[in-house]
């Protein structure tokens, strides 16, 4: 008969057990015993809840220098991230990586749009001259997706301020050939150079103007402040911004020498982080490119990859990488593992590379294999600082391309892997030059293109302004269940064995999903 113990001694009796319930992460991922695992093959065991989900911080480093407030990145794929996605990912606390399957000038223009979108003091505003026509002002409004352009004597910064042309001034003006001086507002509220951002915000707040020009003692325009940016600061408190209040922006380049010119254009446009994009990151080409970037642009942080082993990581860290991108063949539109017989299951990859990179203070990004919110949490638990998403974001409003109705009657958007034949043979986006898909997979000179990806479609997910907050809230609740209040505590708990894991059999995976119902509706979130 089992002895019934004093219930008040339960916590003391628990200490008699040699280890916590479940498995240590190293036991979980011991591939010698049970093969390498991926996200569906395990669960994280719950801990103790002593705080609210709202108190969970998701601040994380994506490179040695840059920290974001939501551990989420959008992939540099031509059906996922252009300037609209990059802007909204940054506003929501993450980071968008603009793809490079386009001419360098087009990519630089996208970077420029991100950097202009939200600012404190706008140090390089779009300035009009007295000879600019109303029609030209309308074209600029369409191009930049904002209005309120200062007009100066020379049409440049550091020139005498004459007025401001607002959207209302030009919207219904019937003679487009008129100069903007005929419609501009001259009743201006300005602030003197040297005004602090807080003081300037207060002047703008108390005025009824949309823009606040900052002028020097001679009345020359030196910068601009926007009321719409104040509203963005209220609506997007997690925004990934620099001290200058500009949004953080990343963009991809290939390992080819020709992209050195591309990178110069991106840097001139204001780029913060460059992602050296390759399907197999441990190459002489990428190592040479990293070293060149470090010597030429020391203020630009480099995310290198993709890799799946410690050996690959060591080579890129030694070359100077500031962050690592993990994943090979695990993406939803990727067939590298099937075709090349090269790669690694994503859970094993993330743990191996992240544990090694952490010893050098290099953050890692789990890229690929993410099918749902739970996979994001598992990637973070295995040591990644952030998770990169492709197909999860491809169906959102902010991704490139138009919606269409599938044969099944669903609203979908096109999505294609960068290793697909559709991308490798697409000369349109690349401007007839080198193709980013072929470059990524070292196939640009091949007579026979071997696909390492597929093209397809993904179901409409709505706007990321709703979807990303759902992901953020879900990660916070998950960390609350695990019993850790931030990502550093999660990583520490996993490493010291306090955060435990359990493997899942096929039956366990079935049990952990919806089962036994006649029918159901799977609505993931409401807002």
Swiss-Prot record:
Residues 121-183, 184-240 form the CBS domain. IMP binds at residues 332, 367-369, 390-391, 452. Coiled coil: none annotated. Keywords: CBS domain, Cytoplasm, GMP biosynthesis, Metal-binding, NAD, Oxidoreductase, Potassium, Purine biosynthesis, Repeat. Pathway: Purine metabolism; XMP biosynthesis via de novo pathway; XMP from IMP: step 1/1. Belongs to the IMPDH/GMPR family. Residues 518-527 have a biased composition (Basic and acidic residues). It catalyses: IMP + NAD(+) + H2O = XMP + NADH + H(+). It holds the Pfam family IMPDH. Signal peptide: none annotated. It is found in: Cytoplasm. Residues 506-527 are annotated as: Disordered. The active site is at residues 334, 440. This is Inosine-5'-monophosphate dehydrogenase. One of its GO terms (biological process) is self-resistance to endogenously produced metabolite. Mycophenolic acid (MPA) is a non-competitive inhibitor that prevents formation of the closed enzyme conformation by binding to the same site as the amobile flap. In contrast, mizoribine monophosphate (MZP) is a competitive inhibitor that induces the closed conformation. MPA is a potent inhibitor of mammalian IMPDHs but a poor inhibitor of the bacterial enzymes. MZP is a more potent inhibitor of bacterial IMPDH. It comes from Penicillium brevicompactum. Its main location: cytoplasm. GO terms for molecular function: IMP dehydrogenase activity; metal ion binding; nucleotide binding. Homotetramer. K(+) binds at residues 329, 331, 334, 511-512. GO terms for cellular component: cytoplasm. NAD(+) binds at residues 277-279, 327-329. Its EC number is 1.1.1.205. Disulfide bonds: none annotated. Its cofactor is K(+).
């Amino acid at each position: 008969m089992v002895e019934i113990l004093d219930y008040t001694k339960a916590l003391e009796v628990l200490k008699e057990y040699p280890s916590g319930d479940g498995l240590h992460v190293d036991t979980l991922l011991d591939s010698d015993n049970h093969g390498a695992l991926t996200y569906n093959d395990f669960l994280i065991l719950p801990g103790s809840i002593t705080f609210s989900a709202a108190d969970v911080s998701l601040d994380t480093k994506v490179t040695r220098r840059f920290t974001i407030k939501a551990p989420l990145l959008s992939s540099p794929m031509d059906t996922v991230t252009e300037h609209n996605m990059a802007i909204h990912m940054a506003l929501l606390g993450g980071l968008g990586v603009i793809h490079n399957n386009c001419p360098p000038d087009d990519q630089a223009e996208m970077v420029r749009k991100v950097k202009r979108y939200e600012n404190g003091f706008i140090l390089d505003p779009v300035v009009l001259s007295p000879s600019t026509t109303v029609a030209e002002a309308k074209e600029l409004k369409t191009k930049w997706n904002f209005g309120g352009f200062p007009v100066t004597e020379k049409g440049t910064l550091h020139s005498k301020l004459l007025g401001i042309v607002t959207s209302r001034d030009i919207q219904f003006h019937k003679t487009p050939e008129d100069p903007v001086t005929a419609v501009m507002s001259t009743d201006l509220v300005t602030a003197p150079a040297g005004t602090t951002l807080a003081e300037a915000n207060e002047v703008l707040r108390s005025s009824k103007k949309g823009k606040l020009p900052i002028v020097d003692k001679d009345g020359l325009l030196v910068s601009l402040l926007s009321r719409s940016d104040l509203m963005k600061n209220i609506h997007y408190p997690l925004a990934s911004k620099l001290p200058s209040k500009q949004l953080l922006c990343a963009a991809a380049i290939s390992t080819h020498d020709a992209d050195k010119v591309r990178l110069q254009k991106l840097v001139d446009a204001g780029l913060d982080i460059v992602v050296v994009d390759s399907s197999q990151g441990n190459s002489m080409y990428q190592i040479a490119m990293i070293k060149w970037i470090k010597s030429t642009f020391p203020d630009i942080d480099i995310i290198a990859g993709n890799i799946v082993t410690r050996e690959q990581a060591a080579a890129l860290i030694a070359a100077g990488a500031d962050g690592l991108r993990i994943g090979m063949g695990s993406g939803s539109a990727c067939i590298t593992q099937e075709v090349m017989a090269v790669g690694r299951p994503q859970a094993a990859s993330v743990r191996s590379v992240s544990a090694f990179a952490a010893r050098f203070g290099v953050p890692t990004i789990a890229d690929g294999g993410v099918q749902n919110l739970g996979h994001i949490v598992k990637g973070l638990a295995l040591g990644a600082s952030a998770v990169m998403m492709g197909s999860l974001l491809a169906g959102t409003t902010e991704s490139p391309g138009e919606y269409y109705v599938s044969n099944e009657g669903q609203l979908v958007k096109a999505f294609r892997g960068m290793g697909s034949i559709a991308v490798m043979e697409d000369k349109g986006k690349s401007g007839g030059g080198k193709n980013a898909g072929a470059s990524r997979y070292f196939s640009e000179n091949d007579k026979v293109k071997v696909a390492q990806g597929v093209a397809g479609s993904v179901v409409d997910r709505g706007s990321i302004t709703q979807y990303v907050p759902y992901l953020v809230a879900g990660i916070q609740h998950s960390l609350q269940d695990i019993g850790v209040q931030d990502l550093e505590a999660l990583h520490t708990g996993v490493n010291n064995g306090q955060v435990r894991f359990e493997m899942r059999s096929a039956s366990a995976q079935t049990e952990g999903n919806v089962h036994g119902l006649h029918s159901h509706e799977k609505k993931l979130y409401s807002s």
